[in-house]
């Protein structure tokens, strides 16, 4: 049994790259949704809700699609000491975030949602990442060369400079990049059965 058409509701080049690893054919749609974090909700609930909102916003464009596509939405945040580190607005924010992560373990939470017709499934994957200490000079070099402004927590684990400072990871590597592919794959398998 083949998969239904998959539509990735994301502008992230990393999510597209990760989903390509599945070997599945898919298309992408660009959507704009507010990524409002509700302090009354847990981090996990927030990223699941935002992923669901992205999938629901995207399905509006495909209501008359007779192929019955699966919309995939996702949202990723970094958290340390219960505080959420989103995407930095500028180099000063990126520096502040990266200084907080030095020599410490933090969590990367990605919520993803699959929406097909009226069926909605979502979950959250969490990965723990520990970074070695970086000097301020190394951090500034990273910020100036990697442009981490579209990345939660101000870094990409796959970036050449940052890869030198990741001392351990517990959980899914692809989750840290923005999409827990093995969990998405298992959820897609359930949808088609």
UniProtKB/Swiss-Prot annotation:
Q: Which GO terms describe its cellular component?
A: cytoplasm
Task: Quote the catalytic activity from the record.
Answer: dTTP + H2O = dTMP + diphosphate + H(+); UTP + H2O = UMP + diphosphate + H(+)
CDD domains xref list: Maf
A Pfam family matched in the record: Maf
Enzyme class, top EC level, equals: hydrolase
GO MF term (any one): dTTP diphosphatase activity
Matching entries from InterPro entries are given as: ITPase-like_fam, Maf-like
Chloroplast keyword on record: no
Q: What is its EC number?
A: 3.6.1.9
**Which key words are in the record?**
Cytoplasm, Hydrolase, Nucleotide metabolism
Swiss-Prot/TrEMBL site (Important for substrate specificity) positions: 14, 76, 158
The cellular location(s) given in this protein's UniProt record come to: Cytoplasm
Q: Does the keyword Phosphoprotein feature in the UniProt annotation?
A: no
Name the Gene Ontology biological process terms: nucleotide metabolic process
CC cofactor: a divalent metal cation
Record family assignment: Belongs to the Maf family. YhdE subfamily.
Describe its function.
Nucleoside triphosphate pyrophosphatase that hydrolyzes dTTP and UTP. May have a dual role in cell division arrest and in preventing the incorporation of modified nucleotides into cellular nucleic acids.
How is this protein named in the record?
dTTP/UTP pyrophosphatase
Organism of provenance: Chlorobium phaeovibrioides (strain DSM 265 / 1930) (Prosthecochloris vibrioformis (strain DSM 265))
């Amino acid at each position: 049994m083949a998969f239904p058409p998959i539509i990735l509701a994301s502008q992230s080049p990393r999510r597209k790259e990760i989903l390509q690893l599945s070997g599945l054919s898919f298309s992408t749609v660009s959507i704009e949704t507010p990524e409002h974090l509700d302090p009354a909700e847990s981090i996990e609930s927030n990223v699941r809700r935002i992923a669901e909102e992205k999938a629901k916003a995207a399905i509006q464009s495909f209501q008359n699609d007779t192929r019955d596509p699966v919309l995939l939405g996702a949202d990723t945040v970094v958290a340390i000491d219960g505080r959420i580190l989103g995407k930095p607005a500028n180099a000063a924010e990126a520096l502040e975030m990266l200084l907080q992560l030095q020599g410490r373990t933090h969590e990367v939470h990605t919520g993803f949602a699959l929406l097909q017709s009226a069926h909605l499934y979502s979950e959250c994957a969490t990965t723990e990442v520990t970074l070695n200490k970086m000097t301020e000079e190394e951090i500034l070099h990273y910020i100036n060369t990697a442009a981490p402004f579209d990345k939660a927590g101000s870094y990409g684990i796959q970036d050449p400079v940052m890869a030198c400072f990741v001392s351990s990871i517990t959980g899914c590597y692809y989750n840290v990049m923005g999409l827990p592919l093995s969990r998405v794959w298992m959820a897609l398998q359930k949808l088609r059965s």
